[in-house]
């Protein structure tokens, strides 16, 4: 409300001066508003943060598998004919195995090292001096040592110097850590913290400072999709032991294929869930994921889920999950030194419910956008596969892209389709997203 008339009646002697003052005040307000508008127009708009690509090879390097190379009465006994050549064929660079004192076992680890596969060894009560001696013997072939494996489970009967879980676990981890740290030859070897069989038992163990890398065994329960419980259960419990800042590895995770068991899923569902599990954990910053396990240990005669976790059947024939992972690794591997990473100005529109994504880049400048539906591909109650219809979405890109090449690793290493768009520029594409990884290779226009 303008109070100028009241002021004028009260101060008639000063009417002229007040009139001038009011006029000048109004003018100044108008100028201020005009300046404000002008300034706002001149300021650059706040730029949205564009999705930043991660190194394609860092994704490939984040995958490992569990092995049991000393179980020579199982399929692992066929090291030369199946295990070694199939590990090489898969293309992984990391395995996890037990810390056994066995020269034949050591020789196998050294052989794998010569073809680019490093090992982490688990020690669950071995004398700490023995751990140091083993680490020295296998120097260069092992990349980390790991503390007690699921010592909270009665099944493993863990005990150290008469102490069981949790006291014995803490004591052993501390003494193993100390022995490795004081020896000049092993002090730089990373040490992985203990794993829990049941995540909630992390509360009993508490924070453990004697290690460099956190650990979790993140098996999705009851045939559920890979994201089930990862954010609400597995990672929080692991962080109870490791704290908030140390890198986190999942040293065991996966699915078995004995479908009569509550935890079992079909091989078809495994080819969908296992690559998605890897992607989902990578998206959450889990630095390494070790699938359990590489091969079915024995032919399934009695119906045992434990014998059906393999990516390979016991005769060495590949399950669909093995082939899918092999194709994904072959497509995305890109070893070499670090390089500048780009961002991608893009947006998915349409029905994007449950459509998840990962953006990667190779050193040649090509970007790889991986899309999948994070949905239930297996009905655990009915024990059957679920047919998931592709989700139709639109990919809109402001970053200049000259070509898009699509791959479906579950089917082939070869392209499914490609698009060059109009005038050599792809701005918008209709995409059908399945419940398994769809890899879109995006070639920047500047490369043409």
Regions found by a protein language model. Name each.
Residues 259-334, 339-351:
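Aromatic/acidic polysaccharide-binding cleft in carbohydrate-active enzymes
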Residues 25-26:
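C-terminal motif of bacterial Sec signal peptides marking the signal peptidase cleavage site
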Residues 37-101:
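Boundary/entry segment of secreted carbohydrate-active catalytic domains
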Residues 95, 214, 252, 281, ...:
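Conserved, mostly hydrophobic/aromatic
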Residues 53-58, 82-89, 102-118, 132-142, ...:
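Acidic (Asp/Glu)-rich catalytic clusters
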Residues 122-132, 164-286:
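Noncatalytic carbohydrate-binding groove/subsite architecture in carbohydrate-active enzymes
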Residues 416-448:
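C-terminal beta-strand-rich structural cap/linker in extracellular carbohydrate-active enzymes
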Residues 345-400, 438:
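Carbohydrate-binding surface patches
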């Amino acid at each position: 409300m303008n109070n100028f008339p009241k002021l004028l009646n009260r101060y008639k002697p000063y009417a002229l001066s007040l009139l001038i003052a009011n006029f000048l005040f109004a003018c100044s307000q108008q100028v201020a508003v005009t300046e404000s508008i002008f300034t706002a127009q001149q300021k650059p708009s706040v730029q949205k943060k564009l999705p930043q690509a991660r190194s394609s090879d860092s994704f490939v390097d984040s995958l490992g598998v569990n092995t049991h190379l000393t179980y020579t009465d199982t399929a692992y006994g066929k090291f030369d004919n199946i295990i070694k050549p199939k590990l090489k064929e898969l293309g992984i660079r990391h395995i996890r195995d037990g810390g056994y004192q066995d020269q034949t076992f050591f020789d196998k680890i050294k052989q794998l090292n010569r073809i680019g596969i490093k090992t982490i060894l688990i020690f669950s009560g071995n004398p700490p001096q023995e751990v140091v001696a083993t680490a020295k013997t296998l120097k260069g072939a092992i990349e980390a040592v790991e503390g007690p494996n699921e010592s909270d489970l009665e099944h493993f009967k863990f005990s150290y110097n008469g102490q069981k879980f949790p006291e014995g676990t803490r004591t052993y981890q501390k003494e193993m850590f100390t022995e490795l740290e004081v020896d000049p030859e092993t002090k730089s070897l990373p040490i992985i913290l203990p794993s829990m069989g049941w995540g909630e038992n992390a509360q009993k163990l508490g924070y453990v400072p004697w290690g460099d890398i956190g650990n979790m065994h993140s098996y999705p329960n009851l045939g559920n999709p890979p994201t089930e419980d990862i954010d609400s259960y597995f990672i929080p419990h692991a962080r109870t032991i490791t704290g908030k800042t140390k890198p986190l590895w999942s040293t065991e995770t996966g699915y078995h294929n004995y479908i009569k068991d509550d935890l079992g899923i079909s091989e078809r569902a495994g080819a969908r869930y296992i690559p998605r599990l890897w992607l989902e954990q990578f998206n959450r910053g889990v630095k390494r994921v070790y699938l359990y396990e590489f091969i079915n240990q024995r032919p399934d005669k009695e119906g045992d889920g434990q014998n059906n976790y393999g990516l390979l059947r016991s005769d060495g024939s590949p399950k669909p999950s093995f082939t899918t992972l092999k194709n994904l690794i072959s497509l995305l591997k890109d070893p070499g030194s670090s390089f500048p990473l780009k961002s991608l100005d893009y947006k998915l529109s349409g029905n994007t419910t449950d459509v998840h994504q990962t953006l990667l880049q190779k050193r040649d400048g090509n970007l790889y956008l991986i899309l999948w539906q994070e949905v239930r591909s297996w009905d655990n109650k009915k024990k059957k596969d679920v047919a998931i219809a592709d989700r139709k979405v639109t990919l809109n890109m402001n970053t200049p892209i000259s070509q898009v090449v699509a791959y479906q690793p579950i089917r082939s290493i070869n392209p499914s389709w490609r698009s060059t768009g109009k005038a050599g520029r792809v701005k918008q594409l209709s995409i059908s997203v399945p419940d398994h990884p769809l890899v879109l290779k995006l070639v920047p226009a500047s490369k043409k």
